[in-house]
Amino acid sequence: MVLGLISLAATVPLTATSVLSLQSQAETRRSQGVDNAWKTNKSYLQARASNRTPEDRKALFDGSKVVLHDGLLYVELQSSAVKRHPFTGYFLAYPDSKYDGLVSTISKDPPQLNWIFLDTSSLQIRHGLRTEAETGITGPFGAVMVAPSEERRILLEGWEGFIAVESNQPGLWGLYFDRYDDALKGRVPEGRRTVELELVHEDIEGDSQQS
């Protein structure tokens, strides 16, 4: 796909040879069959409160989605008056590794790509160039298919540990990863609400990584 070549070359940054290598890897994955083809299709990420969430907070997240804003990933509630750029990306083999990373466009024009990564200090999910991403955890990202709906939910390091933390901006919650399974102990400002999340992979209809 032309977008992938231009965006990666402009933002990761990579040499022309590296960009062509990544495209080749994506083509190889597609050739492996339909079981893997979905990974290279652009998608949105819908955010949903887990079943363990109190009903009053769960309702807040109806129709919410993951967005990118000022180098960070957030959950934007449907009630938000300001609409930010939605996560619009796909899985991509992370350079010089044996695992998949995640990339997303950061704007509509130009449609540049950034890597998605975990800030190891704050445990907030961020986006940036490869040099920025490598200061944090770049993967492995994956997905699990959940029956009976057959929806795919995003994993990081093999599990669903995503948490939304209320921010000081109306309708916007920070996206965090509870890496140590301790409810983000010591990292949540006093008085801020938190919600355990499921991130649902939603294919963009009609899109495929083909030029």
Q: What residue spans do the PLM features occupy?
A:
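Extracellular glycan/ECM-engagement signal in secreted proteins
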Residues: 2-50, 64, 128-129, 134-211
